[in-house]
Amino acid sequence: MEISAINLSLSVAVSSMLWSLPLAIFVAWLLARKNFYGKSLITGVIHLPLVLPPVVIGYLLLVAMGRNGFIGKYLYQWFGLSFGFSWKGAVLSSAVVAFPLVVRAIRLSLENIDIKLEQAAQTLGASAWRVFFTITLPLSLPGVLAGLVLGFARSLGEFGATITFVSNIAGETQTIPLAMYSFIQTPGAEEQTARLCLFAIILSLISLLLSEWLSKRMQKKLGQGNVAD
């Protein structure tokens, strides 16, 4: 059960970050570069998972994306896609709770980029897409990586939304936190609980240290760029 929970946790965390990254980059760019009506409201909605109880998030996902949910039922009828009580639902839960952290890190990185660089490229005839992929995205890459690391760490620790939305099924939805929950309720399973706890602490600490290193690297690069200007 331990190895299965560890492998599933890593798979869920990586998958949730890869699937949510394109949307996170787009949303971060939209919030950093555009002014539009309702921007504050959208920002608040995006950051709701940071303040809502995870159980509430899980319930909302169940209502919306469950097999009988107002979105999930059409996904199941038309494409045979079901999120409830499957590892895909665990990926979705992790992606939702980690999404604000990824967006915030990328947005801060974008806001620190000198917009004059983008304007100069456009003046020289570069298209908006070319400016984004050759200037904006490369310069924001440290922030993107930092956001991914933070989101990965948050996904590893997700419990409430996952157990509410997809239950606690060994080998299918039972990630490290859910496996620890099961072990805690099992007499004589203290050793297994301690091993999973230690693994989670080490992995989370490595993720946070990596995120901090990437943030400092980003600040150093931006500082060098300002000196060069």
Swiss-Prot record:
Q: What is its main location?
A: membrane
Q: Which family does it belong to?
A: Belongs to the binding-protein-dependent transport system permease family. CysTW subfamily.
- Molecular function (GO) terms listed? molybdate ion transmembrane transporter activity
**Topology in membrane:** Multi-pass membrane protein
Keyword terms: Cell inner membrane, Cell membrane, Membrane, Molybdenum, Transmembrane, Transmembrane helix, Transport
> What is the official name of this protein in its record?
Molybdenum transport system permease protein ModB
| SUPFAM superfamilies according to UniProt | MetI-like
Coiled-coil residue spans = none
Domain (ABC transmembrane type-1): residue spans on this chain: 6-214
Q: Where in the cell is it found?
A: Cell inner membrane
Keyword Membrane carried by entry: yes
Question: Record's Gene3D superfamilies?
Answer: MetI-like
